[in-house]
Amino acid sequence: MWSGPPQPDQGLPPPLAAVPVPWKSTDPCQGHRESPGALVETSAGEEAQGQEGPAAAQLDVLRLRSSSMEIREKGSEFLKEELHRAQKELKLKDEECERLSKVREQLEQELEELTASLFEEAHKMVREANMKQAASEKQLKEARGKIDMLQAEVTALKTLVITSTPASPNRELHPQLLSPTKAGPRKGHSRHKSTSSTLCPAVCPAAGHTLTPDREGKEVDTILFAEFQAWRESPTLDKTCPFLERVYREDVGPCLDFTMQELSVLVRAAVEDNTLTIEPVASQTLPTVKVAEVDCSSTNTCALSGLTRTCRHRIRLGDSKSHYYISPSSRARITAVCNFFTYIRYIQQGLVRQDAEPMFWEIMRLRKEMSLAKLGFFPQEA
């Protein structure tokens, strides 16, 4: 609805009333003129119609602009809300991803720690099992060694009890000590030597050496007895102590000093280590061992002396599979030294329960056997 004349700044044309219109006849055939009132009404209607058209157009434009602005504002608000909601969701997702990442890192760390702990525990268990196995094997080996040693000592003790006789034995109770001319033939079965292998401390009975007259005088050597008592206070197998050093120099060394020096050194070391074995000769084929150009596999040649003798025994050093045939004389010398070492080992281990003087005389008897064997005296074998 039009409310008044338009303002000059709106660019609308001036009203028709302000424009002078000349009087002119529009129809030459018309013989009269219109009245001024009718003309004024017609001009006013046209003017009103001309003014309402641009105002309506401007109003429509304004309305369109207002609607467009409203649509833009609503679209902008909607987009802002969508952006805000998307940012919020993205933030939540980022937080969730960060939380899940922390959980994953924690799980990975726990898994790594658990794996390391399992490996460490497994390694510890394996190490403990290996240590227990090694300890068990060591104990088993020691137990077997002790069993072997005890068996050898029992055998040696039996032999020592059998072969040890008093200085003046009762020949009526022991007819085997009589000479063959006085003893006469004996009925029944006689003892024969065992054919099984025997360790060196348990071989060669020494009864043939210990025959002494009924009235044998004895006197203790004070120097030897003092050295023995000093050794007895702290028994040892160290050859540097005065007591054993004298025995080595006077008895053991000369008794084991054979022609074949190389083999003599090995035999002496085996006797000291208690690893020498003496066995009776068997009929099976044996490996040949050469020592200083002497055929040690022959039963007619002694590997230690190099002399041609009937060899009824052979020796083996330690765990070696090689054997050396020895003559009766060489065997007697070796067994005499073995008997001495066996007895001093018993003293060292506390197995001999005697006073100092009886122990001293037993050692002197064993030294006497070594001296006799070195000089070539040995019992004849049946």
Curated annotation (Swiss-Prot):
Record field: compositional bias (Basic residues): 184-194
One term under GO cellular component: cytosol
InterPro entries in the cross-refs: RAB3IL/RAB3IP/Sec2, Sec2_N
Domain of life: Eukaryota
Region (Disordered): 1-60, 166-198
Keywords: Coiled coil, Guanine-nucleotide releasing factor, Phosphoprotein, Protein transport, Transport
Coiled coil: 73-161
Sequence ranges of Low complexity compositional bias: 45-58
One of the GO BP terms on file: protein transport
Residue numbers carrying Phosphoserine: S168, S179
Sample GO molecular function, one term: guanyl-nucleotide exchange factor activity
Record's compositionally biased regions (Pro residues): 1-17
UniProt xrefs under SUPFAM superfamilies: Sec2 N-terminal region
Family: Belongs to the SEC2 family.
Function per UniProt: Guanine nucleotide exchange factor (GEF) which may activate RAB3A, a GTPase that regulates synaptic vesicle exocytosis. Promotes the exchange of GDP to GTP, converting inactive GDP-bound Rab proteins into their active GTP-bound form. May also activate RAB8A and RAB8B.
Subunit structure: Interacts with RAB3A and IHPK1 through the coiled-coil domain. This interaction is competitive. IHPK1 kinase activity is not required for this interaction.
Protein name: Guanine nucleotide exchange factor for Rab-3A
Organism this protein belongs to: Homo sapiens
